[in-house]
C-alpha cells in the first residue's frame, strides 16, 4: 500500500470518528457530563489532527484563483475554526471533572458561548462534509456497477428523503432557537431512547450535507459557465 493511500485511509478514519463524536456530543444530557467532556477532548484532538493531515490545503488557501466555490469553502472552514476554538475554551471553563481544578471564572458567559458554538459547530461541520461529499460519492461510485444506474437514482431519492425529514427534525428539535440564542437552555426528554434522538440529529446532519453538497455544485457550475462564456 502506497504512502498516499495510507494517509487517505487515516483521513477518512479521522473524519468518520469526528462525525460520530459530533453526533454523540449533541446528546449532552443523555451521555452524561463526564462523558461529554471526554468526548469533547477527543473531538478537539481529532480536529487538530484533521488540520495536520490537510495542511497542504491550508498552505494553498491564498494561492490560485479565488472562485465562489473556494470562497464558500474557505469561509466555512474559518468559521468552523472559530466556533471549535470557542467551544474548546468555554468547555474547559465549564468543566466539572477534567479541568475542574483550574477554577476558571466566567461560567455564565462560557455557558452561552458553549451552547451557541456547539450548535453552530454541528451545522458548519455538516456543511463542510457536504462540500466534500462529491469526493465521497466518487469513491463509492467505483463500487457501483456502471450498468446499474438505477442504484444512483435510488441513492439520490434516499438522500432527498433524509434531507426532507431533516427539515422536520431541525424544527422539532428547536435548532433555530438554539442557533439564534433565543433559548438559553436545552430541553432533553429523559425518557426518549438515545437512538431516536441520534436518528433525528443524523437526519439534520443529512440536511446540511445535502445543502452543502448541492450549493457547492451550483458554485462550481457558475464558475464553469463563466469560463465557457469567456472563451
Residue map of PLM features:
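Membrane-embedded alpha-helical bundles that constitute the cytochrome b-like, heme-associated redox core
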Residues: 1-231
Amino acid at each position: 500500500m502506497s504512502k498516499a493511500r495510507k494517509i487517505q485511509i487515516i483521513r477518512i478514519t479521522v473524519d468518520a470518528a469526528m462525525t460520530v463524536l459530533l453526533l454523540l456530543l449533541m446528546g449532552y444530557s443523555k451521555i452524561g457530563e463526564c462523558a461529554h467532556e471526554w468526548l469533547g477532548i477527543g473531538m478537539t484532538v481529532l480536529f487538530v489532527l484533521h488540520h495536520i493531515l490537510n495542511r497542504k490545503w491550508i498552505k494553498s488557501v491564498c494561492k490560485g484563483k479565488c472562485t465562489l466555490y473556494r470562497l464558500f469553502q474557505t469561509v466555512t472552514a474559518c468559521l468552523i475554526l472559530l466556533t471549535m476554538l470557542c467551544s474548546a475554551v468555554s468547555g474547559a471553563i465549564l468543566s466539572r471533572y477534567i479541568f475542574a481544578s483550574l477554577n476558571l471564572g466566567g461560567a455564565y458567559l462560557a455557558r452561552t458561548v458553549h451552547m451557541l458554538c456547539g450548535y453552530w459547530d454541528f451545522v458548519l461541520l455538516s456543511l463542510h462534509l457536504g462540500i466534500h461529499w462529491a469526493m465521497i460519492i466518487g469513491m463509492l461510485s467505483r463500487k457501483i456497477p456502471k450498468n446499474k444506474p438505477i442504484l444512483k437514482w435510488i441513492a439520490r431519492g434516499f438522500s432527498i428523503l433524509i434531507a426532507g425529514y431533516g427539515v422536520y427534525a431541525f424544527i422539532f428539535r428547536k435548532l433555530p432557537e438554539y442557533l439564534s440564542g433565543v433559548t438559553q437552555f436545552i430541553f432533553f426528554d429523559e425518557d426518549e431512547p438515545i437512538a431516536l434522538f441520534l436518528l433525528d440529529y443524523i437526519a439534520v446532519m443529512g440536511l446540511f450535507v445535502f445543502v452543502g453538497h448541492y450549493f457547492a455544485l451550483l458554485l462550481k457550475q457558475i464558475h464553469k459557465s463563466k469560463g465557457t462564456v469567456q472563451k
